Amino acid sequence: MVNTMKTKLLCVLLLCGAVFSLPRQETYRQLARGSRAYGVACRDEKTQMIYQQQESWLRPEVRSKRVEHCRCDRGLAQCHTVPVKSCSELRCFNGGTCWQAASFSDFVCQCPKGYTGKQCEVDTHATCYKDQGVTYRGTWSTSESGAQCINWNSNLLTRRTYNGRRSDAITLGLGNHNYCRNPDNNSKPWCYVIKASKFILEFCSVPVCSKATCGLRKYKEPQLHSTGGLFTDITSHPWQAAIFAQNRRSSGERFLCGGILISSCWVLTAAHCFQERYPPQHLRVVLGRTYRVKPGKEEQTFEVEKCIVHEEFDDDTYNNDIALLQLKSGSPQCAQESDSVRAICLPEANLQLPDWTECELSGYGKHKSSSPFYSEQLKEGHVRLYPSSRCTSKFLFNKTVTNNMLCAGDTRSGEIYPNVHDACQGDSGGPLVCMNDNHMTLLGIISWGVGCGEKDIPGVYTKVTNYLGWIRDNMRP
């Protein structure tokens, strides 16, 4: 009888142990059930895209011009050939051919070699990312921990801020795939992964490109001198932008200010250029132009999506004299890199170059303050960074100088150098760049000065290192 009781007690204890171990297994089973519920979706074996129950799509036949219409039915793709016609508007990127179903509005892109995705937006040859990877459109899909990324279109991400069903998903690089992206201007590409039954954000293991191209150029030694500087070619300053504004009371447009290309779709400039508060649709940005109004062979022109002026800009002292223009484009890429068009490198937050470091400025501004017109050709000037002790009101006729400003000027003197290099009216918003780690790097934005080319009086520039956070925050989608 005692042995029987012991046996029953042992069975009860074993049963209790099994019951108490259930929560861990149940968690796993919940995850497995979720996977099975997700499994009623369809995976297109040709494109590897995932579609939900009853969702339909078009797909091209790889070896023919036929197009199939497919529908997800209980986890299986049911497909049949449908007649198509050319799309009425441009929908495919990177040279893709667009076909639209004859009887309904859906479309499909036949992508050239090296590209895939709904709109040929995925670059299968992209093996690394540049800068922070905001424009990375490759196929890397593994996080730094080795986990596989979740498809951005997954129902599991519906309540997340960034998913493939956002209205601006294609612009952010999101869609029906699980490739690493950086839609929020983070420090590098990332994705969502499953860890301990939770969805978390993890950075990806995609490598950074070994050599950044920002700040590189094919410098041409200037041959002609001009008052205030030297005539130059755009290939010597490929980050230089020209900003134009529509005339308010007449047709046409006028040159407004200079600007600086800092990424494919963003131009940095001076806030004081927009004191008249031009709406974005009245602005135009030209890149790759040597002559101010004469079109160049390799120039690129863009309308403006956004004009962001620093919220604390002081139009009296010119403190916080900084603004951002977002270029308008139908794709994630705006400016195409070339010898004439290339972004400048932004500085590290702690970058401090030695006093009297030689730097360069460029712009289409006046030759001197009394000139009636702006320069017809791009000019460059060579100036040196002034010590902070020489960048004060005392040396600038009691004008206000804040910690958000820096000074630079031409320190050459004597009869050999009668032409003092300096910025002037019309150069505003342009760059002050210096060599750092073999790349030209943006130190300042041309802001204000006392006259133009006055001996021993420096020009004043917006100190870019003070605004890296502001730039980053405002470039976020």
Curated annotation (Swiss-Prot):
Its EC number is 3.4.21.68. It is found in: Secreted. One of its GO terms (molecular function) is serine-type endopeptidase activity. This is Salivary plasminogen activator alpha 2. Probably essential to support the feeding habits of this exclusively haematophagous animal. Probable potent thrombolytic agent. The fibronectin type-I domain mediates binding to fibrin, and the kringle domain apparently mediates fibrin-induced stimulation of activity. One of its GO terms (biological process) is smooth muscle cell migration. It comes from Desmodus rotundus. The active site is at 272 (charge relay system), 321 (charge relay system), 428 (charge relay system). The lineage of its organism: Eukaryota, Metazoa, Chordata, Craniata, Vertebrata. The keyword Nuclease does not apply. Pfam families: EGF (PF00008), fn1 (PF00039), Kringle (PF00051), Trypsin (PF00089).
